[in-house]
């Protein structure tokens, strides 16, 4: 355990917050995209589809790198049991709170919007369970994955710490080219695992809990570990905060490949396996693009930025049902996709900020949506 706090990484705090907030335009643009979602506009927009695909291709990979970075930083600061307890509470309590307060009402809303209420009694017990798994976890899936990664990383982080204590500090002698090869091979390995599952027991890939607990965790664990390694090796972090033309061009080419795979790939063939390889390497390259831009533009302290850093998780949690409400009841009355998209941003962000301010004034809600217990103020009054 280290008693010396690490310097504040303002740009990483900011990037993490903006990646969370990108979930709002991501889901609103999904309404107007060619992708089939819970609610869609009458006519899709090609440019909002492109915008949606771009966000989807890299956002969570970069997010999990930052999560791994801060997780290991806190691992060195706290005793093991306290570290695990704090980390799990910070993500687990908001997730468990959001299920009854947000995703359950959202599920009920969608049942009426999609006129599925009459079909519910006809479903089998497993179909009901699986439907609830998908719908109640919903956009909270990354919190569940973070709980799993935090638990799994206990052994990995302990091993990293012992290596740091027993060996002399040395540079992480690995270039971005070598990292790209490693992540390409990791993408191929993930694709192979998925293909084997598809051949042996394809039905399990449609199981919500299996998807969240196994498949999503397997895909994002390399990015989580990479974040921890970036904290351990400052030279590795420097590779990500230094602009790389190769990474920028590589990410652009990977995104084109991603779009072509979306356009011409088939789910019954190799589309999902190909996508996993593409998004694995694109995610790595976008870490460089996002970190270098963030380091140059966001590495400063600002009260306004700090406000959104603190508010980002709450806003992300509440934005999803607000977006679905907007798509179901307001989108049909707006003929222009552009105007609808902009109105959606204003509607969702405006209400989310109002709800955020309200919840700050209710201690129980503030605890439930942050996982942070209230700080006890010691009385300064003197007796006698």
From Swiss-Prot:
Any single GO BP term: glucan biosynthetic process
Pathway annotation: Glycan metabolism; osmoregulated periplasmic glucan (OPG) biosynthesis
Taxonomic superkingdom: Bacteria
The keyword Transmembrane helix belongs to this UniProt entry's keyword annotation: yes
Enzyme category, top tier: transferase
Protein function: Necessary for the succinyl substitution of periplasmic glucans. Could catalyze the transfer of succinyl residues from the cytoplasmic side of the membrane to the nascent glucan backbones on the periplasmic side of the membrane.
Protein name stated in the entry: Glucans biosynthesis protein C
